[in-house]
From Swiss-Prot:
Keyword Transmembrane belongs to the record: yes
Main location: virion
Name of the featured protein: Matrix protein 2
Keywords from the UniProt entry: Disulfide bond, Glycoprotein, Host cell membrane, Host membrane, Host-virus interaction, Hydrogen ion transport, Inhibition of host autophagy by virus, Ion channel, Ion transport, Lipoprotein, Membrane, Palmitate, Phosphoprotein, Signal-anchor, Transmembrane, Transmembrane helix, Transport, Viral ion channel, Virion
Compartments (UniProt record): Virion membrane; Host apical cell membrane
Organism phylogeny: Viruses, Riboviria, Orthornavirae, Negarnaviricota, Polyploviricotina
Membrane topology type: Single-pass type III membrane protein
Length: 97
């Protein structure tokens, strides 16, 4: 008899498990990990917009400016802004026949 039929055998009009070693530490650890995984998955699905928005905008703050003189910071800001302005001014016009 296979393990599958042994586990899924009806016991007293209910579906049950015939394993007697369910207090095994490995089984307990697997159950805890499974429950934590389910909780984290549910939280991820509920709050995925907040979570991913935080990571998306939180990681785009740019390089650290700690220890950099203010004049160099201002120069860097101007370079970044001029690069953004240059990108905004280039548009391609496509006409379909």
């Amino acid at each position: 008899m296979s393990l599958l039929t042994e586990v899924e055998t009806p016991i007293r009009n209910e579906w049950g498990c015939r394993c007697n070693d369910s207090s095994d530490p490995l089984v307990v650890a697997a159950s805890i990990i499974g429950i934590l995984h389910l909780i984290l998955w549910i939280l991820d699905r509920l709050f995925f917009k907040c979570i991913y928005r935080f990571f998306k905008h939180g990681l785009k703050r740019g390089p650290s400016t700690e220890g950099v003189p203010e004049s160099m910071r201002e120069e860097y800001r101007k370079e970044q802004q001029s690069a953004v302005d240059a990108d905004d001014s280039h548009f391609v016009s496509i006409e379909l026949e």
